[in-house]
């Protein structure tokens, strides 16, 4: 367990509004190893996305702990959490969240520029990552000029540009047709082998989840089943 990349123990999340309490996560515990491809499958409202937010330090648990490379993530300062998110964790969402007025290359380079990298170096690295995701012919295209699958490829490139240890992907193929979704999952497997980056993917699609190393099922805030692919 000490060599695990990401570990959570007894994670609970309770939302309170007036006199109403809603327990979304009910004591979730598991570990992700370096370079592992893991899926979390469950229906809408089962707690999958909430869990991902806690693991990425985008929200605080009501109880329990998250450890990243042996460090307790949820007890760190906001600045330390932000540093780990920027340098160690990539994020991909159902909607690509690309900047409409910028090219694919500029969107991918943006995290590097924000981190202080020189423009020429940032653009060179962005191009190399776009090459990796099969978009060497789309450097200068804006999001409106790309297909849905190409936009998600750019989103994955942006998530990978800082060489993160893990990418957290929340329904990354939810807006795509089945054929394109399969291509995106094949891309994740390819990137995992080439870069060594671990992936934790939230999805409701069992067929797509089966393409990864391990599949965990969530139901009503509980991790109820673990399967090895």
Swiss-Prot record:
As for what it does, the entry says: Part of the ABC transporter complex LolCDE involved in the translocation of mature outer membrane-directed lipoproteins, from the inner membrane to the periplasmic chaperone, LolA. Responsible for the formation of the LolA-lipoprotein complex in an ATP-dependent manner.
Which SUPFAM superfamilies does the annotation name? P-loop containing nucleoside triphosphate hydrolases
Task: Report the protein name in the record.
Answer: Lipoprotein-releasing system ATP-binding protein LolD
Q: Which GO terms describe its cellular component?
A: plasma membrane
Self-association or partners: how does it assemble? The complex is composed of two ATP-binding proteins (LolD) and two transmembrane proteins (LolC and LolE).
The residues the record assigns to binding ATP are 42-49
Give the main EC class.
Answer: translocase
What is one process in the GO biological process aspect for this record?
lipoprotein localization to outer membrane
Q: Which UniProt keywords apply?
A: ATP-binding, Cell inner membrane, Cell membrane, Membrane, Nucleotide-binding, Translocase, Transport
The record's EC number reads: 7.6.2.-
Query: What is the source species?
Result: Photobacterium profundum (strain SS9)
Q: Which InterPro entries match?
A: AAA+_ATPase, ABC_transporter-like_ATP-bd, ABC_transporter-like_CS, ABC_transpr_LolD-like, LolD_lipo_ATP-bd, MacB-like_ATP-bd, P-loop_NTPase
The answer to whether UniProt assigns keyword Zinc to this entry is: no
How does this protein lie in the membrane? Answer: Peripheral membrane protein
Task: Give the family per the record.
Answer: Belongs to the ABC transporter superfamily. Lipoprotein translocase (TC 3.A.1.125) family.
Which terms does the record give in the GO molecular function aspect? ATP binding; ATP hydrolysis activity; transmembrane transporter activity
Its domain of life reads Bacteria
Q: Subcellular localization, per the record?
A: Cell inner membrane
